[in-house]
Amino acid sequence: MRNLCFTLCALGLAANAAAQMLINGAGATFPYPIYSKWFDDYAKIDPSVRFNYQSIGSGGGQKQILAQTVAFGASDGPMSDENLAKAPGKLLHIPTVAGADVLTYNLPGNPKLKLDGPTIVDIFLGKITRWNDQRLADQNPGVKLPDLDMVVVHRSDGSGTTYIWVDYLSGVSKEWETKVGRGTSVNWPTGLGGKGNEGVAGQIKQLPGAVGYVELIYAKQNKLPYGDVKNAAGNYITPGIESVTEAMSAATIPDDFRFSMVNPTGEKAYPIAGCTWLLVYEQQKDSEKGKKLVEFLNWAINQGESMAAALDYAPLPDNVKQRVLERIKTIQY
């Protein structure tokens, strides 16, 4: 009897596993903490489906959704017109949450620092190479800056976090825009590469004098300091939910939802913020998976948004949320 029970239980588990639908996605590391939370929680709501998300960077997510090797991609940089033209069908940008890119560093005592855009540009151009540079000292009176070499750390993979960062640098510096420009991957003038937000944070944590950029939650998780950045209104702003929300509120959001949030006009807006998108085809080629994907998207925008703040992301404003829900209704399966 015991063996029979064991066999029946095993068969039941196997049947459940076989019945569970797998939906694959890939892309940005920037939203990985909240996406993994969403997928875990949604598995309890609908056990018939499991979402498998590979956090490989926005560039990889865009490539895989274009190749249709995943059901959805994820990116912190909107797809270019050129890439959208390569898609075998109409691709939709579904905004999910917004977050902050932060300048993080590894210094003795890890003091709180303030920096303006031109100073950050010159660090990443390799023009400022030591921590006691006068431009840093002038913005941080009373802070003892060490006589220490800077080690710039940037992303080595195609990255939406990079897209937000260099979009900001291009906006505040014509030299950066001309020499380096925008994109999910650029030719860096200086520095070491790290794979993913995790890789950059890991390098900064290990290297004295290191400086780089990561999404806010990765700095917090790794107990790394991050600087206040001077915004377009002339105020030094701490990155956080309120300052990112103000940045999103100041952004102009077009019908296709491809927009930039960097360097907005708000008095309290953090200047290096960005939205992140799920990329899905309007016409789903697998009707069953398409239906499950749409059900998840509706849940994420309606219920999942409430989880954003706990992970240091800014949820969509109500007016944007309603527009996104209307766009999800256009997905066909």
Task: State each model region's role.
Residues 1-4:
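Positively charged n-region of N-terminal signal peptides that target proteins for export
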Residues 19-333:
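Flexible loop/hinge segments at secondary-structure junctions
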Residues 6-7, 17:
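Cleavable N-terminal signal peptides
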